[in-house]
Amino acid sequence: IILILFQTVFLIGYVPSESMEPTLKENSLILGFRPYGELNTGDIVIFEHEEGVFVKRIAACPGEEIEVEGKTYYVPPDSYLLLGDNKENSYDSRYWEDPFICEEKIIAKLLLP
């Protein structure tokens, strides 16, 4: 039963970089919840990106407008703008060709750092 839970409900991973410091230290273990329900600004999520699996914080949700470093973003339906807490050392929405991550690419919502 525990194995089934970790295949379908929970996700254990690690933080691959310094991009979420000081909240999450590089290489620290994290626990995510797969049937994450509603996502809100401020939630930390684990998601797939064309360059790998990342851990970032939701900066803006579908339908929201946000200004980041002088640039205004309008978040489309079913998408999110994601940023690392360590803005000086984070490869995130600010640098991607398409700055938005669609909800289907979100794997889990962080439960425990």
Where are these regions (language model features)?
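Extended hydrophobic leader/signal-anchor segments used for secretion and membrane insertion
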Residues: 1-113
